Amino acid sequence: MRYLPHTEEEIQEMLEVVGKESLDDLFSSVPAECRYQGDIPIPAALTEWQLKDHFAALMSKNRVNQEHKVLIGAGSYDHYVPEILPSLMSRSEFLTAYTPYQPEVAQGTLQGIFEYQTLTARLLGTDAVNASMYDGASALAESALMSFRIARKKKTVALSAAIHPHYREVVATYLQATDFTIIELPVDAEGRTDLSSLAGIEGLASVAIQSPNFFGVVEDLQGCGEKIHDVDALFISCFSEALAYGLLKSPGECGADIICGEGQSFGLGRSYGGPGVGMMGCRDKLVRNMPGRIVGQTLDTKGKRGFVLTLATREQHIRREKATSNICSNQGICAMTAGMYMATLGGTGIRQLARLNYDKAAYLRSELIKLGAKPLFDAPVFNEFALRFPFDFERVREALKEESVVAGLSLEAYYPDLQGAYLFCATETLKKEDIDRIVSSIKKHALQEV
């Protein structure tokens, strides 16, 4: 819709209709001290040519992955996107489709989402998967709310301090105006969640553990599940790197009741951090409390296989006060992209890619340790890891930017007690020669300090 400002004649005509002589007369009920005085500092209009030049100048300030080597993950990972994905997803049948309310004219969209659910359920080892949330953070927050619906009178959720800080912030935002309570569980010397205090928490509805966690450490999900169930709480397993489960035992196999996390690694670009795709699944017995939509398989009147929305507990389907979620249609395109990615690689491809990521991170870690870096934690890691250096790495990090290398995320901003610690990540997009060159540059800049 275009915005065309009113002409003076139109303004006068409207004032006459409402019986006012001027705009000041129209807004006389607003005290003079509350009105903005002076001109609004809006620049003059630009021609089309000038506008294109203006945006070109703004775009030139951007820094993109293709021009840099980025050794940072922390919830947003640089993975190769097969060319078949943008080709398929650009088809108007998928790209412009809205909520498939009429299954008779939306079988393609519904089947695409159904296949996403099936592949995600296999990856995560769970019974049922919904048609996606906004991102990993909202999926975790919705999982916490889901656990409260199931546990009824219990009002507390325990979150591991090793869960992505942004995820924990979103959960806190969801719960801040409620009577629900969040308790943070500490991290032990190995970088894993310390569950020793669970028995002393009253009204515990659920416990959320991320694996691999924010530090890249692989949690003992099997052991966590047993301890959580021992205190009669629901086990929420979350993740920020879905690819890890191409190599690791799935959360469902480890006893997780609710599984949630970020699927950005599966065919979605980083794009300033979004859009993501919130993966979410649960056990069959909990499915009626799961938010969002589920696409189900059925038979039509002629006995042919078809797909329909089922258990659609969104506020636009049922009464708002009974709804479990208000996640909207735009996530369907992201879910379908993730489904196409999994179908393109297949189980073997995802497993091989996960192994490649593990090996790249292990090689980078070993090379940095040779420079004197000390691992923050000794537990097994996937894709990323935390280190401390015997020299001023912040200065080295700034110098590397001049070489188009973005290396290491300072953990101090998220964990003040981890001053001088940095989080690194390596994926399949980082070649061995890239790693060797970057390590040599770090060594060169570190020696300049001595």
From Swiss-Prot:
GO terms for molecular function: glycine dehydrogenase (decarboxylating) activity. It is an enzyme of class 1 (oxidoreductase). It catalyses: N(6)-[(R)-lipoyl]-L-lysyl-[glycine-cleavage complex H protein] + glycine + H(+) = N(6)-[(R)-S(8)-aminomethyldihydrolipoyl]-L-lysyl-[glycine-cleavage complex H protein] + CO2. InterPro entries: GcvPA (IPR023010), GDC-P_N (IPR049315), GDC_P (IPR020581), PyrdxlP-dep_Trfase (IPR015424), PyrdxlP-dep_Trfase_major (IPR015421), PyrdxlP-dep_Trfase_small (IPR015422). GO terms for biological process: glycine decarboxylation via glycine cleavage system; nucleoside metabolic process. Its EC number is 1.4.4.2. Coiled coil: none annotated. Signal peptide: none annotated. SUPFAM superfamilies: PLP-dependent transferases (SSF53383). Pfam families: GDC-P (PF02347). Belongs to the GcvP family. N-terminal subunit subfamily. The glycine cleavage system is composed of four proteins: P, T, L and H. In this organism, the P 'protein' is a heterodimer of two subunits. The glycine cleavage system catalyzes the degradation of glycine. The P protein binds the alpha-amino group of glycine through its pyridoxal phosphate cofactor; CO(2) is released and the remaining methylamine moiety is then transferred to the lipoamide cofactor of the H protein. This is Probable glycine dehydrogenase (decarboxylating) subunit 1. It comes from Desulfotalea psychrophila (strain LSv54 / DSM 12343). The lineage of its organism: Bacteria, Pseudomonadati, Thermodesulfobacteriota, Desulfobulbia, Desulfobulbales.
